[in-house]
Amino acid sequence: LKGGANHVYMSGPQPGGSDGTAGIFLLYEYPAGGTGATKYADGNHVVRAFPEGDFNVVQAAEIAEMQCPVRIEQYGLRDDSCGDGEYRGGCGMRRDVRILSDSASLSVLADHAVIPPFGVAGGYSGDANRFVVIRDGKTIQPSPVPGKVGDFALLKGDIVRMESSG
């Protein structure tokens, strides 16, 4: 029904404490995607599947910023990520997370990062999931395999951009 399973993990030393650290932080993000259109209506934007339980679509920025050394710089719909057709699919989301700790790591396990969710019944495919790091204004692919990232080293000031499929 939606763009695919997305699991994004950012972790590293939590600033504070007598030795400069107060343990380890872990920010688990699960950027939701849009649903496909039906024969009679547009799809829904940024939806979690019902069998996944009572999750928010994404964590509130205020909670993430209180618990982890990050700043949410952007959160909104990923414009035009939905599949076109007589009725359009729902849009995915875009979320930019700036790392405020001296170091951190990024891991991603996601589907539909190469082959986007396909359209059916005359509808067109939505955009594929995309996960990149922005460092000093340059976009970095954190892995040669899109959607599969293991322990990519993040630096203070890096922005992790998550763009879910429509």
Language model regions located:
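Glycine/proline-enriched, intrinsically flexible loops and inter-domain linkers
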Residues: L1-G166
